[in-house]
From Swiss-Prot:
Name of the protein this chain belongs to: Thiazole synthase
GO cellular component assignments: cytoplasm
EC number: 2.8.1.10
Species this protein is from: Staphylococcus haemolyticus (strain JCSC1435)
Cited function: Catalyzes the rearrangement of 1-deoxy-D-xylulose 5-phosphate (DXP) to produce the thiazole phosphate moiety of thiamine. Sulfur is provided by the thiocarboxylate moiety of the carrier protein ThiS. In vitro, sulfur can be provided by H(2)S.
UniProt keyword annotations, A-Z: Cytoplasm, Schiff base, Thiamine biosynthesis, Transferase
Any GO BP annotation: thiamine diphosphate biosynthetic process
Gene that encodes the chain: thiG
Pfam families in alphabetical order: ThiG
Amino acid sequence: MFKIGNLELQSRLLLGTGKFENEDVQTEAIKASETNVLTFAVRRMNLYDKNLPNPLANINLKDFITFPNTASAKTAEEAIRIAEIAKHAGVCDMIKVEVIGDDETLLPDPFETYEACKVLLERGYIVCPYISNDVVLAKRLEDLGVHAVMPLASPIGTGRGINNQLNLSYIIKNSNVPVIVDAGIGSPKDACHAMELGADGILLNTAVSGAKDPVKMAEAMKLGIHAGRLSYEAGRIPVKYTAQASSPTEGLGFL
């Protein structure tokens, strides 16, 4: 259990709700993950256009912390407008600020992200910005007052795992707010790795929804994240460059 702002998260797995084959698979995967935080793109909801489908219609959102994101925003102004739509619809316990700066890599725009966070904090939101693994930006956003930072492991949807372990480690080490690794996680191994580095949680979607068996993968991710956290808390042995026997050398005098 950990907190973002005044919200208590029962699970360190935050699950995206898009791209599932159907509602039944989505529901079973959510159940298997044991998450209590669901994230979704506001633009995919029927919050401002009732003619659009509601991909969360079969989910009782009262059982979850709702974590909408501002996906599709390319400016701070657009991100703020999307956040306001979610808030007025009553599905915004906290907001993931996602402002894309490049259409090919889908990397976040640091300048627009910062400006959006500044305004949303002034308006009383629990703000969690999605960022690249920029150590300086993470600290500047923390100084601004964000409630968590969400550095990517690798570009959205690539499943490449952690591309820059050094920078991610710096962000985790220097942060006084929760660090949620977001984007690029492809397997439970990737999720476990991020948690072993000391991340507070993992946000993922495609790794589960795109798996051959999303329900099993949701459970695997849950277990991988749990194992990684336990490993971090237990403290791994230091890496050495010479072999060291695990058996005692006493009692070998008779040889």
